[in-house]
Amino acid sequence: MHRLLLIVTTASYRAGAFLEAAGRLGVPVVVGSERPLALAAANPHGSLTLDPAALDPAVLAVVEFAARHPIGAVVAADDDGVILAAAAAAALGLRHATVDAVAAARDKHRMRGILAATGIASPRFARLAIAGDPREAARRVGFPCVLKPLALSASRGVMRADDESQLMAAFERLASLLSRPEVAAQGGAAARHVLLESYIPGVEVALEGLLSGGRLRVLALFDKPDPLEGPVFEETIYVTPSRLPIPAQQAIATATAGVAGALGLDEGPIHAELRMNEQGPWMIEIAPRSIGGLCSRTLRFGAGVSLEELILRHALGLEIESYERERLAAGVMMIPIPRAGVLRAASGQVQAREVAGIEEIQITVPIGQEVVPLPAGARYLGFIFARGETPGSVEAALRAAHDRLAFDKIGRAHV
C-alpha cells in the first residue's frame, strides 16, 4: 500500500490521532514537519522536513521523496500545513482540494470578498495595516465590530470593540501581538494586516464535514452553549448533536455547502464556525481541515470509527462503511486559562472523573510551564470529555467536572 504523507507541526495536538488511525488501517506514514523529528535518523523513510512557509522547495522535496517511496494521500492535521498539503497533492496528482480554494479559505479577507461577491450573507469588513489607524475603517464597518488577525488561527487575537476607545485599545493590543518576532516570522505578510468586521449576534455552532466531489456530508453539528459575545471569544464547550430546530440545522448545512462551493473547496475535511440569528446562518470561519485540539475524540462513526480514520479512508479512496455518528450525545470542554502565569499545580481530577458521563480528563499543559489566556494565548489547560443520553446531560457533566478542578495555584511568571 502507498504511504500517507501526514503534514503536522511539531507542537500539534493532532498527530497522535492520525497516526493511530493509520495504524488501524495498516497504512505506512511519512510525517512531514517543519523541524526534523527526534527519531528521523532511525527511520529516514518515515519523515520529511518540510517548511510550509517555503512552499516550492517543500513541494519539490515531497515529489522527489515520492519518486522513491510512492505516496497515496496527503493530509494536513493543522491550519499551518493545509496549503502545503494541497500543493503537494496537486503535484502528485492525488485527491485533494485545490491550492487556490484552500488558500482562499485560509485568507480571512479574501474569503470575505468572495462571499460578498457571490451574494452570501456577510458582515461589513475592511482590511487594514497594523501600522495604520483603524478609525476610518471602523466608520465604514460600524460598531460593534470585531478585530481579527489574518495570520493567527482559532480565536487567538480576536477581540470585540463597542466604541472607538475599545477599538483603539484592542487594535494596539493586537498590533503588539502580531509584532512579536515569532508571530511575524510565521505569519509573513499576513501578520502585517488585520481584518475589521461588523459584529454578528446570534448563537454559535461548529460544523464538522467531509467534502467528496463537491458534495458536503455533515458529520456532526456542535452547539456552543456558552455565549461568545466578547470582548474575547474563548471557546469552551462543544456538544453534539445540536439542540437547534431541524430547519435551522438544515439551513446551516446548506449555507456551509454554499460557502465551500463559492471558495472552490470540493474535497476533504472542513471545520466551519457559523452564527445563527433571525436572519439565518452567517459563516464566521471555514477551515479546510478537521476540528482542532483533542476535540475529535468526541466523534465516533459506525462501529467505533474515529474521525481521523474516516478522513484517511476518504483521502486514500478506501471504503467508508458509515458516516453516521454514534447514538450517544458527546461533548468536550476546552479548559480555559483563568489568568497568565506559571501553572504550579492542578488538582481535583480524581473527583472530576467521578461525575457521571465523564470519560476522560487530560491536562495538556505541563506543571511549571507558563500559560497565557486569550487573546494572546494559543492553547488551553486541557480537555474534558463526556458522553450521555442527551446533549443536556453531557453539558451538565462537563460543567460539574470543571467545577471540581482547581488551577488556583497559577502564579506569576518568572517568580
Regions found by a protein language model. Give the residues of each.
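ATP-binding N-terminal substructure of ATP-dependent carboxylate-amine bond-forming enzymes
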Residues: 1-101, 129-132, 363-381, 385-412
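Active-site "cap" helix and flanking loop/linker of ATP-utilizing ligase/carboxylase catalytic domains
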Residues: 2, 250-272, 278, 287-345
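A conserved helix-loop-beta module that forms one wall/lid of the active-site cleft
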Residues: 90-157, 164, 176, 180-182
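Conserved ATP-binding module of the ATP-grasp superfamily
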Residues: 121-123, 140, 144-147, 160-201, ...
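Beta-strand scaffold of nucleotide-dependent catalytic cores
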Residues: 159, 169-173, 197, 204-226, ...
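Short amphipathic alpha-helices in soluble, non-transmembrane regions
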Residues: 173-175, 346-349, 394-403
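Glycine-rich active-site loop/lid that clamps phosphate-bearing ligands
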Residues: 336-367
